[in-house]
Every structure is written in structure tokens, then in C-alpha cells.
Amino acid sequence: MAANFWESTQRRNWLFTKEELAARRQQLENEDPSLVTMYPLPEWRHLYNYFNYQMLRLAKNLSIRQQAIATAQVYMKRFYTRVEIRSTNPTLVLVTAVYLACKMEEMPLHIRNVSLEAKKVWPMETPSLEIAKIGECEFWLISEMSAQLIVHQPYRTLTALQQDFQLANDDHVLAVSFLNDHFMTDLPLLYAPHTIALAAIMLALVLRLSKASSSNNAAAGQQGGAQAGPLGITLASGLSMFQQAVAAKAMTPGGSGSPAMSSPIQQNPPNQAYQLTPQQQEMFRQQQMQQQNRQPETQAKDSPQKEKSKLQRFAAWLSESGVDIEAMIDCTQELIAFYECQESYNEQITRDQINRFVKARGL
């Protein structure tokens, strides 16, 4: 087992550029173009979203931790860089990926229990979820991944940096939600775990600052002022402020320059708000209710100035580190694009398109 990410097979063999990843997928589709034409599928973000939801259904029945689910999601991504999805039964693959991930994350489940619970979740798929089928698919997964099963996750980096950046519990919880969501994108195949963790921290701090500023403005304009809600959060202005903070620190006598910041951040229109996941919406709603019930002196702890100082401290640290800030920014843009993509996601359509080729091909 690799002691760290830098010596791991994940870094050597399972990180690609966007162009390399697109080329791999195109190569798989080119092996049988008629199959691709006959059974069109949604974009990968929609497929990942669907697979994530299905895994969570199984995880709930088997009390599986998020760490194992995250590893299973990475297994599926790796597998489908080498195998065309239309030649598989994705439900069987995801069940097997969960079973294998639980072994690797030291919470093994008996294959009989996995098969039994999977049949309860997907009764129409019962013939494909027999023990023998899962066992056979497990060997297929291991073979296609060249037995390289160690997955380094960004959660450890987030936990290690929580105290360094003085992240409040709410900051940490929000950053974790972004990490959970990034598994529904291509990011685990594109960037190192620490880069993704730092991007999640940045998004959490930006959103928390936006929330604190909105609450402060609403309190100052209670008479006739519009009430600020936590769901219509615009990230463009926050990311712009973050870039300016890093650039300003780099120009100070004690700061070190950061060439990665010389390229401008691609921003969306400043009046465009991004839709958060239902879990994040519920979390923000609960946080807002808690804030309304606090005493005035407690509310002051979440002042915009305090949240801004966190972001500035984080930006200062980045400007003096060797972190690839451009890669971080790209991670945040991928997540933003994912949230935008969710607005057009339709679970029923995605399920029907998958079931269509599975049934037609007898998978």
C-alpha cells in the first residue's frame, strides 16, 4: 500500500487531463458506433448523479459509511474509462463496486447480505444481482483496474487543515458537502485529493461570507428591505474577491508571487445564482433558523468581517504555498457547472435510458 498520494498508483495511473479523459471515452464509443447511436445516454454528470443516488439507497440499507461510497464511486469512474458503459449492467457494477469498496475501506460485508439487500432495492434486477454475478463482476472490476484499489480521498486533507484555517464546524460541514458532491463529477480523475479539498474549503468560505453579508444587509434594512435568502447565492463575486485577495497578498513585501493567478478566472454573469443540492439547501435553511434564534452577541461571531478574515487568511496561505491555484479554480468551476447541470437532471429519463440498453442486450 502506498504510504501517501505522491507514491500511489492513483497519482501515476489514474489522473488524466480533460483531453485524455475525453479521448478515452471517445475511443470506447468508436469501438461500436452503432451501439452508441442506438442507445443514447445523458451526459456523464447526469449518470454520476444517478449512480450516486442508487448507491446511497443501498448504503442506507447496509449502514455503509460515506468513505466507502466515495471509494465505490471512484471505482466506477475508473472502470468506465476502460469499459464502454453500454456493454455492462450499471446496477450490477455499482453494487459490486460498493461491495469491493467496503472490503478496501475495512468494513467488509458478506456477499450474501449485499446480494439480498440489492434485490430489495432493485427487485426488477434480481437475476442480475445473484451472488455468482456479483462475484464474477468483482473479478472484472479488479482486472480492469489492474488491481490498483487504493483510493486517496480529500477528506483527510480537509480534517488536517480545519484547525490551521480556523474553520468553524459549519465551515467544515459545508466543505464536506462539496467533497461529497465532487464525486458526481470527473474531478477524482482530474486532480489530486488535496487540490479538491482546498477548492471545497474555498467554496465553503465564499458561501459563508456571502451568507453572513446577506444576513447583515437584511438586518440593516429591516424596514422595507428585501429579505436575503440562503439559496440564491452568487459565487462569481465571491470567487473574484478571493482572486483579488490572493493577488494582493502576492504583491505585498512578505508575499510570494503566484504565476497561476495571472490567468483570469472565467466568471459567469454576476446576476446568475447557482442551485445547490437539496442537502445543502436543507443545511443552509437550518443554519439560518439557528442564526435567527441566537442572541445578538452570538450573532456577532458570524459577522461578515470575521468571515472575510477567514477567506483572507486562506488566500494568504495559498499565495505563499506551492499549491496550483489555477487547478483549484478549475475545480470550483467544475463544481459550479455540476450544480447548474442539476437543473436539467431528470432521474426518470436517466433510468429509462439505462434500462433500455440493459434489457435490449440482456445484460
UniProtKB/Swiss-Prot annotation:
Intracellular or extracellular location(s): Nucleus
Subunit-structure text: Component of the SRB8-11 complex, a regulatory module of the Mediator complex.
Gene Ontology MF, one: cyclin-dependent protein serine/threonine kinase regulator activity
Pfam entry (one): Cyclin_N
Basic and acidic residues biased stretches: 299-310
Entry similarity comment: Belongs to the cyclin family. Cyclin C subfamily.
An example Gene Ontology CC term for this record: nucleus
Biased composition (Polar residues): 265-276
Keyword annotations of the record: Activator, Cyclin, Nucleus, Repressor, Transcription, Transcription regulation
Coiled-coil boundaries: none
GO BP terms: regulation of transcription by RNA polymerase II
Protein name: RNA polymerase II holoenzyme cyclin-like subunit
Chain's role: Component of the SRB8-11 complex. The SRB8-11 complex is a regulatory module of the Mediator complex which is itself involved in regulation of basal and activated RNA polymerase II-dependent transcription. The SRB8-11 complex may be involved in the transcriptional repression of a subset of genes regulated by Mediator. It may inhibit the association of the Mediator complex with RNA polymerase II to form the holoenzyme complex. The SRB8-11 complex phosphorylates the C-terminal domain (CTD) of the largest subunit of RNA polymerase II.
SUPFAM superfamilies to which the protein is assigned, alphabetical: Cyclin-like (SSF47954)
